[in-house]
């Protein structure tokens, strides 16, 4: 671990203590996990405290951990992952918070901490259904207004629930149930006579 990351790691442990559920170093970056109840105050401190100085939030996304690693995942299903940058200290940090309720996943909004979180939180809401408590304009940003469900959830059907098409009789775009019929793909192997070792005699 570099001296810079060692300093950041010590600062995090000293300042937050038990609020850190985990602190891991991988690929030259530190990832911390905090509880949903502590998320907002931790994020505010990461921006405001001189020991951290994370003035930029560079990314925020949702994650669906169901069947994580194709094993039996015992943890919570939905998480929010935030990437922070301190230009002054030249270090980065990844913060992960799990939503406690799988039926209605929600965490605090950090739009009052970093205004740039606004559309990122709307995207995570739209694609994963994670609600951000305190967000003043939490509405869909990528899918259509009448879209049903959240398409990045692992249990969302690949073909979706409805499809849109233009109806010339009604002279407008309409929604209808998906008409794609499931099919089985048969793998085909096409080999030329000159393929592989047989081409060299």
UniProtKB/Swiss-Prot annotation:
Keywords: Cell inner membrane, Cell membrane, Membrane, NAD, Quinone, Translocase, Transport, Ubiquinone. It comes from the Bacteria. Its EC number is 7.1.1.-. PROSITE patterns: COMPLEX1_30K. The keyword Plastid does not apply. It is an enzyme of class 7 (translocase). GO terms for cellular component: plasma membrane. GO terms for molecular function: NADH dehydrogenase (ubiquinone) activity; NADH:ubiquinone reductase (non-electrogenic) activity; quinone binding. It is found in: Cell inner membrane. It catalyses: a quinone + NADH + 5 H(+)(in) = a quinol + NAD(+) + 4 H(+)(out). It is a peripheral membrane protein. It holds the Pfam family Complex1_30kDa. NDH-1 shuttles electrons from NADH, via FMN and iron-sulfur (Fe-S) centers, to quinones in the respiratory chain. The immediate electron acceptor for the enzyme in this species is believed to be ubiquinone. Couples the redox reaction to proton translocation (for every two electrons transferred, four hydrogen ions are translocated across the cytoplasmic membrane), and thus conserves the redox energy in a proton gradient. Belongs to the complex I 30 kDa subunit family. NDH-1 is composed of 14 different subunits. Subunits NuoB, C, D, E, F, and G constitute the peripheral sector of the complex. This is NADH-quinone oxidoreductase subunit C. It comes from Dechloromonas aromatica (strain RCB).
């Amino acid at each position: 671990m570099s001296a810079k990351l060692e300093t950041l790691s010590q600062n995090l442990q000293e300042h937050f203590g038990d609020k850190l559920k985990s602190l891991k170093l991988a690929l030259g970056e530190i990832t911390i996990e905090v509880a949903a109840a502590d998320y907002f105050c931790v994020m505010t401190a990461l921006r405001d405290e001189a020991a951290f100085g994370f003035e930029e939030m560079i990314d925020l996304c949702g994650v669906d951990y169901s069947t994580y690693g194709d094993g039996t995942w015992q943890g919570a299903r939905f998480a929010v992952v935030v990437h922070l940058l301190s230009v002054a200290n030249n270090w980065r940090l990844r913060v992960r918070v799990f939503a406690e309720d799988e039926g209605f996943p929600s965490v605090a909004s950090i739009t009052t901490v970093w205004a740039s979180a606004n559309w990122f939180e709307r995207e995570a809401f739209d694609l994963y259904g994670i609600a951000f408590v305190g967000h003043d304009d939490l509405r869909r940003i990528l899918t259509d207004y009448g879209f049903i469900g959240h398409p990045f959830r692992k249990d969302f059907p690949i073909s979706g629930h409805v499809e849109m098409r233009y109806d010339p009789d009604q002279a407008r775009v309409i929604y209808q149930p998906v008409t794609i019929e499931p099919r089985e793909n048969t793998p085909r192997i096409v080999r030329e006579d000159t393929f592989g070792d047989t081409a060299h005699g």
